[in-house]
Amino acid sequence: MKRFPALTLLLALLLVAAPLQNIESAEASNPPRKILTGWLPYYSMKTYLPAVLSNADLIKEIMPFWYTLKFDGKTKKPVIADVYKTANPSVPITEPLTALRNAGMTIIPTITDGTEKLVLANLLAKPVSRKQVVDAIVATVASQNYDGIDLDFEGFAFIDPNTTWKTTAPNWVLFVKELGAALHAQKKILSITTPYLFNPAEKQKGYFVYAWADIAPHIDRLRIMTYDYSTSRPGPIGPIAWTEKTVKYAVSIMPASKVYLGLPGYGKDWVTKVEGVCPANLAKIITPSAKAGTFLMRDAASIAATYGAVPTYNETFAEVTFSYKREYTGTTSSGLSTTCTASRTAWHQNAQSFSVRAQLVAKYQLGGAAQWVIGQEEPLAMVAIREVATSIAPAQLESSLSLSTNQISYGNPVTLSGAITLKDKSPVASLAFSVEGKYPDGTTRILTTGTTSFDGTYSIPMLIGKSVSLRVLTEASWERGASESPALSLVVTRNLILNPPTSVKSGVPFAISGVVLPRAAGVTITLATTTGRVIGTATATDAQGAFTINVPAQARSIATYQITVGADATWPVFASDAFSIIIR
């Protein structure tokens, strides 16, 4: 297939460009808050992938819309189907993923519900099949080392009867709890995308099958589909008051940082009246009873201009509407020429609409906004989001780190010191920070935590048991961005506690004892002169790391020795400092 002949070349260029953009953003004095997330579909990748990458300064997470849940009738098990591969056979999935990762984005692909009516609800009702769904999702995350998963299971809302919701809801909650535990054990993110809910105590509850309050402790993101408000009749896509109402409910039951409001990159276009007889091939869709058509926001102005319509911004709904007439010419079912004129009404959001909704992110300190689909918007819409994001940009921090020494022997302390300031060098007092250690095998862990003093400085003595790369981290808050210091390497060597005699008689054997730290059995201990001549026989440590070397009788002299501790799977060879014994 040659569906995307230029996509591979485009990706190659973007792989180079994305890191440059990150550098420019890092150097900006006030980079915008990354409040935008959104979906990247499996289709039209040549259009939508560049749109995502060109706005990397705004986008912290991207949800590739690449997977769907199916039920395999032969194996009687759920499976996750990869729709990206089918649509893009000539472009390996690793290519767009590399471009997104180079742009610094968290990648949380979406899985949709591609099963038939009540199939998923029945799968979640049984512990065995519910676990099969969990396992299939976890395996999908592992397949490309994704940062997590986003679930867009709309079948409950729009395919299953609402009479089943009370039965489905508790099984859904169990599923989310089990999936969340499985993902969090691997430090992965669980994102849930659902239609709106309102307070269940109110008359209008929304899609309560998704049980936000019950799943809140187990999820990391809630992306609300604050669009498709109007369906059968002309009206706004997602009126601002309705959007704010569901957002207010969400933040009342979970941390606001988990909540993302939806932004539609599309509009809808309804037929309100038809005059004349429409062509036979259009008769079922050019009628007031037909489903509304859709169009991309970026095409709205040209549609209005083509038909002489004058768009009007509705302040109440914070959306744009326009009406127009369009003629359709063709033939009837009997082959006669015919023309009909349809009156149509369109609604869509624009740059001003996006700005108003981005301001809700600021008002409620939300995690951000989620756009369907990034790249469908008019150019000024992204400008509007960027303006709001810049106005609420978190303060940028700088962290420094120094070590009292870059090498210590086991059991001795090292002092970490430094300062955390704003970019203008103003100190940040009473700020919590953590010290992260990264080990040679690639594993990391938090070694200790602390708080800056009144002048933004810190000083922490630490006992560290093995060689490690250290850095100081601060977490992001609404007021401040996350920060990390440069990483510094600390080498930790074995320690050797020696008990040599200060003097011995010549011609008489003597012993030298000691302890190797950290304590370990079977470590080879060798005594030699500083010229390298081995004295006596090598020995090994006992279970407490202790050893004794029996030294043969020596002639009268001032002897200088050195003990070598052999290597093992964890520690390299280590030699003690030279020491002298008077042989009288």
Q: How would you describe each model-predicted region?
A:
Residues I464-S485, S557-A575:
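Enriched for extracellular/lumenal, surface-exposed ectodomains of secreted and cell-surface proteins
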